[in-house]
From Swiss-Prot:
Keywords of the record: Cell membrane, Membrane, Transmembrane, Transmembrane helix
Name listed for the protein in its UniProt record: UPF0056 membrane protein CPn_1010/CP_0843/CPj1010/CpB1048
UniProt key word Cell membrane: yes
Primary subcellular site in the record, as a coarse category: membrane
Signal peptide: none
Top-level taxonomic group: Bacteria
Record-stated family: Belongs to the UPF0056 (MarC) family.
GO cellular component terms listed in the entry, alphabetical order: plasma membrane
Matches recorded under Pfam families: MarC (PF01914)
Membrane topology: Multi-pass membrane protein
PANTHER family xrefs: UPF0056 MEMBRANE PROTEIN YHCE
Compartment(s) of residence: Cell membrane
Length: 202
């Protein structure tokens, strides 16, 4: 039970739904609240479908392209590093709200890469490859984290009114620090295993 809770929390942090709230608020601000809820639900379902495909066929896909998991870990960690830096240096949310968008987003950029990014995919494939936890536990933890992320995003308009711009900015930067640490850990893990250096522990 503790393992499931820890994995669920890890995946929830990797989904970074609180940090994604400013993006959703900016892209969906011109729609009614009911329309926003429908779009968020649809995009989260798209993201879940993509994750299930990666969990089911991810290893075969990378083997077909002759891509090692360690390379994906290193590159995924680097991409996550750049994302975390942008999150920590994020401008005030109202700057992102200046751009008026009347086009309804479909899959990109909300489902991917905002909800389902390289961090989540890399973590899922890594845990599947390592075999430390069963596929059932990993899959269940992913579903739990996804459900909490969906709930968080559905409440985005409420969080926007409650915390305001400064609260959203502080939350985004806090998750940026957490993702930065995870990105370094992910790169160290990939480098350590790929080159058999042995400095990574955990």
């Amino acid at each position: 039970m503790l393992i499931l809770l820890n994995l669920s929390l890890l995946f929830y942090v990797l989904f970074d739904s609180p940090g994604s709230i400013p993006v959703f608020v900016a892209l969906l601000k011109n729609f009614s609240r009911k329309k926003q809820q429908r779009v968020i639900l649809r995009e989260c379902l798209f993201a879940l479908g993509a994750l299930i495909l990666f969990v089911t066929f991810g290893r075969s896909f990378f083997q077909f392209l002759d891509i090692s998991l360690y390379a994906f870990q290193i590159i995924g960690g680097f991409l996550l590093f750049t994302v975390s830096i942008k999150m920590m240096l994020a401008p005030m949310p109202e700057k992102a709200k200046d751009d008026t968008s009347k086009t309804e987003p479909i899959f990109f950029p909300l489902a991917f890469p905002v909800i389902t990014g390289p961090a989540v995919i890399t973590a899922l494939l890594s845990y599947m490859e390592e075999g430390i936890y069963s596929r059932e536990i990993i899959f269940t933890a992913m579903i739990i984290a996804w459900a909490f992320s969906l709930f968080t995003l559905l409440c985005s308009s409420f969080f926007d009114r409650l915390s305001g711009n400064f609260g959203l900015l502080a939350l985004e930067r806090l998750f940026g620090i957490a993702l930065l640490l995870m990105s370094v850990n992910l790169m160290l893990k990939g480098i350590s295993i790929a080159f058999n250096i042995g400095f990574y522990i955990g």
